[in-house]
From Swiss-Prot:
PANTHER family: 30S/40S RIBOSOMAL PROTEIN S3, SMALL RIBOSOMAL SUBUNIT PROTEIN US3C. SUPFAM superfamilies: Prokaryotic type KH domain (KH-domain type II), Ribosomal protein S3 C-terminal domain. Pfam families: KH_2 (PF07650), Ribosomal_S3_C (PF00189). This is Small ribosomal subunit protein uS3. It comes from Treponema denticola (strain ATCC 35405 / DSM 14222 / CIP 103919 / JCM 8153 / KCTC 15104).
Amino acid sequence: MGQKVNPTGLRLGINKTWSSRWYAGPRNYADLLLEDLKIRAMIQEIPECKNADIAEVEIIRHPQRITIMIHTARPGVIIGVKGANIENIGAIIQKKLGKKVQIKIKEVKRAELRAALVAQNVARQLAGRASFRKVLKQACFNTMRSGAQGIKIRISGRLGGAEMSRTEEMKEGRVPLHTLRADIDYGFAEADTTYGKIGVKVWLYSGMMFGGEQKEDAGALLKKQRRPRTEKPAQAGRQ
């Protein structure tokens, strides 16, 4: 099943954490979940964010406000001159939701080690009619050179304008999808071409994560309860 499920969802609480962090009752849960999906869709549609190379959007709900943490490889594009763009983004989201919104930016230092950014880069080049084999080879080379231990890229659609759609895959290194302690990042993107859409999936393996290397905000793991020590009965002295 490791080959079928989403690698991030399979590792939640082990070495991955949730992108949305809040608590709600059964009555409000569905509405808040739908609101999170709308927030992420709005961010992708805002002109200031389309070319910002956004890797992840975290949503943290407080009693009085919503904090949106945007992970991007190009923070200057989102912030803008003297913070004009980030204020505009916050105003647009706040107007549509009717709630107080706080936008925070977190820079992604190494874009080659984030699967979402690799998928977006491949999709962008495919939309520009680049040779898909050359694009896949270059993406794998850049990722492995940056320190990854393995990468797998799969694209599907009318590749090169062919009449029949097909799937092509390229892999470098090892990607152990069945190993739960493996740090595997997953990303997906779509390339809009004149022939139709081409889907891009990326699996990126960065190494093993053991107990002491887990992220601080990851879900709490169950700890083994210590067994109470049983005291040995004192031996009676010889009379």
